[in-house]
Regions:
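ATP/Mg2+ or Mg2+-diphosphate-binding catalytic cores
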Residues: 267-360
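ATP-binding glycine-rich phosphate-binding loop
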Residues: 5-26, 326-334, 363-391
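A cross-family kinase active-site recognition segment
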Residues: 101-156, 180
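Active-site acidic catalytic loop and adjacent metal/ATP-binding pocket
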Residues: 18-29, 34-35, 68, 168-215, ...
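An alpha-helical support segment within catalytic cores of ATP-dependent transferases
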Residues: 1-2, 125-128, 144-185, 388-390
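A conserved alpha-helical element in kinase catalytic cores
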Residues: 37-84, 102, 106-110, 368-392
Length: 392
């Protein structure tokens, strides 16, 4: 019993959707609605959970207009051509552009950070059993991707492997220290609506799960940072603003980069699996290019440097309890490591990296000693940190 179904002056069009059929209804009055016909595999319990979640978020006055209004009193069912029961829901339509299609500015990014933080805050007071479930797209649970590493070759394989290794260290081993709550689960650039440089809508709660709170920020960043020229500026806008409204803990910051890269790993593994299944689908290759570009950039960033940068953006000291540790070091009297003062001797950097001219012809140990001796003369040699060395 909806008035627009009785009207002859409505326009009907189909919206893009991965799992469901979403129909846009336009009334002559300019009002717009969405009729969501769910995949028959979707459980009624899960759909009712999504409705409850949206209603809870709309209780917050600052967020009320960001989420669609649920118009149905109860979920009804439609029988498709294959005699399958499909749930039908009706919501208001949030009219704007997708974040992915928008020319985003500092103001847009700051708006995103603010609303993600307000959403994180509002979700603290919501919990349902339906949120506690396993989910492939969860960046805090990517161990399953290990068995697909061989879908990649060369440097791409190394990047995927390195990202999974970082997940183990910075996310998996830290997971118990991260605050958990119900999350949106998929604030990607096609689930965020923009108008006039402001975020005006979050949509699609089908991936909502109980997970680390920081997941939503990490997932959003894994899309919002794609294609940006200045990663630091975008991080400053989004993370800096998020932190003003929802304080990130030391542990959140410690795991953030690992979570961003984990979401990118999932994206790339899913794309590789699909490409194997549909080798002639050119769209699959195009759609993952931005993910590769971003993960390659992030792979060049030392995780601890990233942590220090995010701490600085959040107006925190470079490391946890920095002042206390610095004071402790200053209060100690340390002995000399050498019988000379490194500050007062002539010294040179000795490069033993695999690209070093000293190792060009794969020389013997004796020859290396002679080459180094000629290079240093009477100077003290200092090796570089984190070199990929052929010799020690």
């Amino acid at each position: 019993n909806y008035s627009f179904f009785k009207s002859k002056d409505i326009k009907l069009s189909r919206l893009n959707s991965e799992r469901d059929i979403n129909l846009l209804i336009k009334e002559k009055t300019a009002k717009k609605y969405v009729v969501k016909i769910s995949n028959p595999k979707e459980s009624l319990v899960q759909l009712e959970y999504q409705d409850l979640l949206i209603k809870h978020l709309r209780l917050n006055r600052q967020l009320k207009q960001i989420y669609p209004k649920i118009l149905h009193n109860k979920i009804l069912f439609y029988q498709d051509s294959k005699q399958r029961r499909c749930a039908v829901r009706i919501l208001t339509y949030i009219d704007g552009d997708m974040y992915a299609k928008s020319k985003n500015t500092d103001h847009t990014e700051q708006s995103l950070g603010r609303l993600l933080a307000l959403q994180s805050t509002q979700l603290q007071s919501f919990i349902k059993n339906q949120a506690i479930r396993k989910f492939e797209w969860n960046p805090s649970d990517i161990r399953w991707t290990k068995k697909f590493i061989n879908l990649f070759i060369g440097n791409n394989k190394n990047i995927i492997k390195n990202s999974i290794d970082e997940y183990e260290k910075f996310v998996f081993k830290n997971i118990k220290n991260l605050k958990h709550a119900v999350t949106h689960g998929d604030p990607n650039d096609y689930n965020i609506v923009v108008k006039k440089e402001k975020i005006i809508g979050f949509i699609d709660f089908g991936d909502s799960i109980y997970a680390p709170v920081v997941n939503d920020l990490a997932i959003s960043l894994s899309y919002a940072l794609m294609g940006v020229k200045n990663l630091y500026k975008s991080l400053q806008n989004i993370v800096g603003t998020y932190n003003k409204f929802y304080k990130l803990s030391d542990q959140d910051i410690y795991s953030l980069l690992g979570l961003i890269k984990s979401r990118l790993v999932i994206t790339l593994v899913m794309a590789a699996k699909q490409r194997k299944k549909y080798p002639n689908n050119k769209y699959l290759s195009i759609s993952e290019n931005n993910a590769w570009d971003l993960i390659r950039k992030l792979n060049k960033v030392d995780p601890y440097f990233f942590i220090a940068v995010i701490r600085d953006i959040c107006n925190l000291e470079p490391i946890s309890e920095f002042s206390k540790k610095l004071q402790l070091l200053k209060s100690q009297q340390f002995g000399n490591l050498f019988d000379f003062d490194l500050n007062n001797v002539n010294k040179k950097i000795v490069n033993f990296d695999k690209s070093s001219f000293l190792l060009k012809s794969n020389p013997s140990n004796k020859k290396i000693d002679n080459l180094v001796g000629k290079f240093l003369k009477k100077d003290i040699g200092i090796g570089l940190y984190k070199e990929t060395r052929k010799v020690y």
